[in-house]
Amino acid sequence: MKSRNGPLRVGIGGPVGSGKTALTEKLCKAMRDDYSVAVVTNDIYTTEDAEALVRMQALTSDRIVGVETGGCPHTAIREDATINLQAIAGLNERLPDLDVVFIESGGDNLAATFSPDLADITIYVISVCQGEEIPRKGGPGITKSDLLVINKKDLAPFVDVDLDVMDRDATRMRQARPFVFSDMKRGDGVGTIVDFLKEQGGL
């Protein structure tokens, strides 16, 4: 099921260092053989994340666009998504068979959200390294995203985090909304996220 404006648009948000780019890379590699995929990355003053995805060979460079948001990166995914919508339109023009576009936000905080005009599905990524209390702090990313990804679960013993506490708090804060624990370094959890996108996005 493509959106009215073309390909399915998946917004990936989360704080700096949570693993957004790693997730984007893994999703691209997992889906590129079956779907026509592209990426738009958001950085404040550089296109560093886009360049990183090219180096990782997530996709060919013509399928990855980096936009420089300047100032506050939240604005480019929420109040005024024009720069991202233009990037998607450009990709769609070059690649008319596009099925999925991942929109990776700049590093943001728990209050950041994607405009519904920009993203059909939203994924919010947090890391266990931020502390086991993060899920219960709430905020739109934690409570309202379509899927919450709790990443770097392998590091929990090293940062004194109890995954059972995070599981309990995420269940309470999100109510019926799904979440998944992941380890992007090893690709653990990627299959579950891909299945979620296929089901929710009608791919």
Swiss-Prot record:
UniProt-annotated location(s): Cytoplasm
Complex formation: Homodimer. UreD, UreF and UreG form a complex that acts as a GTP-hydrolysis-dependent molecular chaperone, activating the urease apoprotein by helping to assemble the nickel containing metallocenter of UreC. The UreE protein probably delivers the nickel.
Superkingdom field: Bacteria
Record keyword Amino-acid biosynthesis present: no
Major localization class: cytoplasm
Keywords assigned by UniProt, alphabetized: Chaperone, Cytoplasm, GTP-binding, Nickel insertion, Nucleotide-binding
Pfam family, one: cobW
Protein name: Urease accessory protein UreG
Family: Belongs to the SIMIBI class G3E GTPase family. UreG subfamily.
HAMAP family in UniProt: UreG
Annotated GTP binding sites: 14-21
Function: Facilitates the functional incorporation of the urease nickel metallocenter. This process requires GTP hydrolysis, probably effectuated by UreG.
Organism, scientific name: Rhizobium rhizogenes (strain K84 / ATCC BAA-868) (Agrobacterium radiobacter)
GO BP annotations, alphabetical order: urea catabolic process
Sample GO molecular function, one term: GTP binding
